[in-house]
Amino acid sequence: MKVAIASDHGGVHIRNEIKELMDELQIEYIDMGCDCGSGSVDYPDYAFPVAEKVVSGEVDRGILICGTGIGMSISANKVKGIRCALAHDTFSAKATREHNDTNILAMGERVIGPGLAREIAKIWLTTEFTGGRHQTRIGKISDYEEKNL
């Protein structure tokens, strides 16, 4: 598996924690920033490139972190083919993979701490899509997307 990871200025610390986790899990990743120091940056400038790498197949999944995770999630979901879910608990992280086959995880650094972020990311990275009735539902989303976006 190969993962693209990015954050804005509000998610740098958790981004670094998740990179350490992926090193431990021997998961290959591309760090797509931000290298923002103390400056403020705009989350869409990081969400769109990660989402584009996922839909192009260059990476399998993406992880996005901002202050709340909301802006990253909204931005990523504007890219056709993306199923980005915001998760701030382990139950949701697992369900987004098992039931929704999410290809991007969003988290908020101002909402959760680094320990919980690592747990969420580990579960999300190691959980597989269950298919079955959930595949039918994903298919309906994809059909709608093809017709309307």
Curated annotation (Swiss-Prot):
Name the positions where substrate binds: 9, 67-72, 133
Question: Which conditions up-regulate this protein?
Answer: Negatively regulated by TnrA under nitrogen-limited conditions.
Q: What Gene Ontology molecular-function terms does this entry list?
A: ribose-5-phosphate isomerase activity
Q: Looking at its record, which EC class is this enzyme?
A: isomerase
This enzyme's EC code(s): 5.3.1.-
GO BP:
D-allose catabolic process; pentose-phosphate shunt, non-oxidative branch
Q: Tell me which UniProt keywords the record has, alphabetically.
A: Isomerase
Q: Which ranges form a coiled coil?
A: none
List the catalytic residues: 66 (proton acceptor), 99 (proton donor)
Pfam families under this entry?
LacAB_rpiB
What family is reported? Belongs to the LacAB/RpiB family.
UniProt xrefs under PANTHER family = RIBOSE 5-PHOSPHATE ISOMERASE (PTHR43732:SF1), RIBOSE 5-PHOSPHATE ISOMERASE-RELATED (PTHR43732)
Record protein name field: Putative sugar phosphate isomerase YwlF
Question: What is the source species?
Answer: Bacillus subtilis (strain 168)
Q: Which gene encodes it?
A: ywlF
